[in-house]
Amino acid sequence: DQAVPFFEAWKKHIETIGFKTLSLRRTGSTDHVVFNGLGLPAYQFIQDELEYGRTYHTVMDTYERLSLEDLKVDAVIAAWIALSAAMDEGRIPTKPGLPAAPATR
């Protein structure tokens, strides 16, 4: 993927808080897919799976099971990636197969 060099450069600054792995592996449909369909490059951030196999999107998927520490780290990583993308002199290439321009209604 042409975006890998961007993410590799950006993650160097935040590896110590937990951003260590970059993967091109597809994991199925997630929230970012809608943005891709509109022609916007969007990427999926995956954290350790923890109890996903038993609780994710079930009645067991409740607020009490949230890890506040993980949410804080995720927020820092997402903010850093957004800031890095905004400040980078380059432009992240659009993913292959995406529309060249966002869809209009």
Q: Positions of the model-derived regions?
A:
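Metal-dependent peptidase/peptidase-like ectodomains
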Residues: D1-T55
